[in-house]
Structure formats: C-alpha cells, structure tokens
C-alpha cells in the first residue's frame, strides 16, 4: 500500500487540497488564490455559550432575589454561593456570545477563530 502524499509546507493530505491549472499566458496569478474562504462558524461553541449565559443569568436573578428577601428560603447563607456560581457561569457565556455577535456583524478585530471550537 502506497502512503498518501502530503503537502510538506502545511502537512495537509493531497486529497483535500484543491488544485487548478494555471494558464501559460498568464503572469502566474489567479483570482482563486486571493479569495478568502468563508469563515467556519463554531455552532457547538456558540450553543454552549448561550446555555452558559442563560443558566448564569437565571442563577444571578435567583441569588439576587434570595439576597433581597423576596424568596425567603435560606437567606444570605444560600444567596451568596448562588450569586458566585451565577457570575462564574455567566461571564464566559457572555464573553463568547459577544465575540460571536461582533464576528457575525463583521467588526474589525473579531472573528470566529477567537471562539474555542470542539473539533470532533
């Protein structure tokens, strides 16, 4: 069995590399090499960030209601841990959703590459 060839510069197997023949009258440049490929959107990471954001928001609201006394089960001894966990869950969700929003709107300095992806 013959091993598959790889592009030595990038280590990509040759079966996944797209080649196109250059015309002999051209100066060696084609439009394809200057086109940017569309960004890969990390849907799983955005879904996880949304879940973290919603759970964190819910825990912050519940912790605030416990602390203020509107919910009378437990008092401040239960409110503070709920608030801390809510903040710890809320912050990464909010951060990654903000990056995803700015990347989708095309703001400069933001891209989907900034969001960690779960490559299977």
UniProtKB/Swiss-Prot annotation:
It comes from Rattus norvegicus (Rat). It comes from the Eukaryota. The lineage of its organism: Eukaryota, Metazoa, Chordata, Craniata, Vertebrata. The chain crosses the membrane at residues 46-66, 79-99. It holds the Pfam family TMEM_230_134. It is found in: Membrane; Cytoplasmic vesicle, Secretory vesicle, Synaptic vesicle; Golgi apparatus, trans-Golgi network; Early endosome. GO terms for cellular component: autophagosome; axon; early endosome; endomembrane system; late endosome; recycling endosome; synaptic vesicle; synaptic vesicle membrane. This is Transmembrane protein 230. Keywords: Cytoplasmic vesicle, Endosome, Golgi apparatus, Membrane, Phosphoprotein, Synapse, Transmembrane, Transmembrane helix.
């Amino acid at each position: 069995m013959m091993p598959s060839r790889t592009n030595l510069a990038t280590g990509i197997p040759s079966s996944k590399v797209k080649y196109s023949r250059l015309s002999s009258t051209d100066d060696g440049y084609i439009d394809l090499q200057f086109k940017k490929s569309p960004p890969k959107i990390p849907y799983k990471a955005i879904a996880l960030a949304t879940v973290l954001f919603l759970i964190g928001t819910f825990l912050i609201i519940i912790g605030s209601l416990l602390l203020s006394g509107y919910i009378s089960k437990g008092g401040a001894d239960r409110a503070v841990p709920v608030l801390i966990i809510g903040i710890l869950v809320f912050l990464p969700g909010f951060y990654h959703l903000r990056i995803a929003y700015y990347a989708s709107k095309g703001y400069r300095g933001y891209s989907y590459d900034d969001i960690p992806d779960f490559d299977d």
